[in-house]
Amino acid sequence: MSMFLDTAKISVKAGRGGDGMVAFRREKYVPNGGPWGGDGGKGGSVIFKVNEGLRTLMDFRYNRNFKAKAGEKGMTKGMHGRGAEDLIVSLPPGTTVRDATTGKVITDLVEHDQEFVVARGGRGGRGNIRFATPRNPAPEIAENGEPGEERELQLELKILADVGLVGFPSVGKSTLLSVVSAAKPKIGAYHFTTIVPNLGMVRTKSGDSFAMADLPGLIEGASQGVGLGTQFLRHIERTRVILHVIDMSASEGRDPYDDYVSINNELETYNLRLMERPQIIVANKMDMPDSEENLAAFKEKLAANYDEFDDMPMIFPISSLAHQGLENLMDATAELLANTEEFLLYDETDMQEDEAYYGFNEDERPFEITRDDDATWVLYGDKLEKLFVMTNMERDESIMKFARQLRGMGVDEALRERGAKDGDIVRIGNFEFEFVD
């Protein structure tokens, strides 16, 4: 049995940059040999790339952690460390990537070979050759590599279909798909025979072609999770035209018009935008007894409940089993599709701003101060912590440079305002030092 997985939660971590090197030339008349330490290489980024050969997120069922390699350390003679290769992660077309914490959409991957850098590799640390000045011609300062970005992501696959088949279970959606395309969905005389979306390519006699998806049957309450619930409703979101398949024979004992209203209510409840998509009503099983009578009653109820200014949906009587009325239905579907533009899947409020991922907002304070129960002052904040991890704490000159950076950020002044005294302990991460007033 083939497995279909359309959601996955994964972790990605880009590689850290390589550390810069402290090294000196050994030449006469050059103080301490002169600085000669090179920069570290850039860490590898994690890149998502669309592979049209993939159809599900099954590859992420057991492999949920993706980590790019770190850049090489800087070398002597001023040579740079080699940058790490990017980690390419293949995804099926139609994958939406969300931030698992905020739920915001990061990117929507639909085109073959489309790429998106989802976690950027860290910058390589600078070697001591970069810190030489007339006042300090032989610095013992080098930076550690910048950490790579690390994120928790939610992947959602929404299949790329132009036309979606919706309706109650066992109304004939799978049979319809199987006779108008080369798809071979599982067909049976019981509810929820279709438990995964099936995709087929339809080609009309006039030469038009489009992708059609048969989605698992909906029942009342699907938008709240009843039956297969919202598990597959997401796949309708990419469609431009909906074929609403209805069993006109009423073989299950339900009223066809009630079925029509119920399914539309579920679509509207799940996502109001789904009702913007044009629908064609497919009156199936017209070869069965009572179907003609039921269709006449259906049309009467539909007309009575439609506003005179609204366009009535087209109705096509067919029999998938007897192959009746299919050509006209497919031609009308192709024509409607040609006159329907793609719908915007997400608005600006759904999308995550780039600023939230890379760089710092200059208007935000670069650090925060709290105090632990043991009276230790604790400093934290993205910008401050980035400076800290890139500082080589094994070299006195690097520590002094870090202290100057803290002072320039206003840390000393802020600690005094909070009541810090000379000799108080200050902690950044796992590094502690005394506050000197």
Curated annotation (Swiss-Prot):
Transmembrane segments: none annotated. GO terms for cellular component: cytoplasm. GTP binds at residues 167-174, 192-196, 214-217, 284-287, 319-321. Residues 359-437 form the OCT domain. GO terms for molecular function: GTP binding; GTPase activity; magnesium ion binding. Pfam families: DUF1967, GTP1_OBG, MMR_HSR1. One of its GO terms (biological process) is ribosome biogenesis. It is found in: Cytoplasm. Residues 2-160 form the Obg domain. It comes from the Bacteria. Keywords: Cytoplasm, GTP-binding, Hydrolase, Magnesium, Metal-binding, Nucleotide-binding. Mg(2+) binds at S174, T194. Its main location: cytoplasm. Disulfide bonds: none annotated. Its cofactor is Mg(2+). Residues 161-338 form the OBG-type G domain. CDD domains: Obg. Its EC number is 3.6.5.-. HAMAP family: GTPase_Obg. Monomer. An essential GTPase which binds GTP, GDP and possibly (p)ppGpp with moderate affinity, with high nucleotide exchange rates and a fairly low GTP hydrolysis rate. Plays a role in control of the cell cycle, stress response, ribosome biogenesis and in those bacteria that undergo differentiation, in morphogenesis control. Belongs to the TRAFAC class OBG-HflX-like GTPase superfamily. OBG GTPase family. This is GTPase Obg. It comes from Streptococcus agalactiae serotype V (strain ATCC BAA-611 / 2603 V/R).
